[in-house]
A protein has these predicted regions:
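Catalytic helix-loop patch of NAD(P)-dependent Rossmann-fold dehydrogenases
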Residues: 1-40, 44-55, 63
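Alpha-helical structural signal
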Residues: 36, 54, 58, 129-132, ...
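C-terminal substrate-binding subdomain of Rossmann-fold SDR/epimerase-dehydratase oxidoreductases
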Residues: 63-261
């Protein structure tokens, strides 16, 4: 079953995948649908109000470190680049501390949602771009399903037929002679997972944060586990290049450089 808090988003994605699959099976088109895991990388969204888990966590830890160091110049630079609830670097120190505390950011301490136990998979965004180009240039739908001729029209169905879609005389995508053809999308990821707590520790290491990372178990964890099976993509000749520890360090370096821009 779909995870309740994510159901609408999941259904929208699944609908797109099935649409590509159905067009291919009915009309012999060559749409390739890729399903990425959680992405991170340059130009990520670091706004605390609506950011993804990794950039949000990274910024929180970074700001907690700056507060401890009493580095108000760096704090103001950060907030001028990305204000929090309208509070930028021109605000009074107390006002800045108040708004940051709403997001669990304090002097050398960060509070994060949940237990830290959920497992997540992360893919460097430039690896995602590379995988997409690889699939575009090297993969056809027939490579995915292992059948050269697969459209119901090719097998004699009428595109305006009135019969049941599972009939050879019908108009649907299903072709009884070929059996069931489904799950034709390609997962794009690393096939490796990490707990949210381990991710926080990796980020703390990259930021050189020595403070306290706390988890608020009264807040929701979300889906317990999100891991893609990337066997299909690996067999089609592509594998990720950037591992999570290197990626976290690269993302923080990008963030620091972006603050200087």
């Amino acid at each position: 079953p779909l995870e309740y808090t994510n159901e609408e988003y999941a259904l929208a994605k699944i609908s797109g995948l099935k649409m590509c699959e159905s067009y291919n099976l009915q009309y012999g088109t060559n749409y390739i649908a890729v399903m990425p895991t959680n992405l991170y990388g340059p130009n990520d969204n670091f706004h605390l109000e609506n950011s993804h888990v990794m950039p949000a966590m990274m910024r929180k830890i970074y700001l907690a470190k700056l507060i401890n160091e009493d580095n108000w110049q760096a704090i103001r630079t950060d907030l001028n680049k990305r204000p929090v609830e309208g509070v930028d670097g021109t605000a009074q120190e107390q006002r800045i501390l108040e708004v940051l505390s709403k997001y669990g950011i304090a002097d050398n301490a960060v509070q994060l949602w949940g237990t830290g136990k959920p497992l997540r998979e992360f893919l460097w965004s430039e690896d995602m771009a590379d995988a997409s180009v690889h699939v575009l240039l090297n993969v056809d739908f027939s490579d995915i399903i292992g059948i050269e001729k697969y459209s119901s029209v090719f097998y004699g169905a009428e595109t305006n037929g009135q019969n049941d879609r599972n009939s050879n005389a019908g108009r649907g995508g299903a072709i009884p002679a070929l059996g069931e053809i489904r799950n034709c999308h390609i997962n794009v990821g690393t096939g490796k997972e990490i707990t949210i707590k381990q991710l926080a520790q990796l980020i703390a290491q990259a930021v050189d944060f020595k403070g306290d990372i706390q988890f608020d178990s009264t807040k929701p964890d979300g889906t317990p586990r999100k891991l893609t099976d990337v066997t299909k993509l690996n067999n089609l000749g592509w594998k990720h290049k950037v591992e999570i520890d290197d990626g976290v360090a690269k993302l923080f370096a990008w963030y620091q450089n972006d603050l200087k821009a």
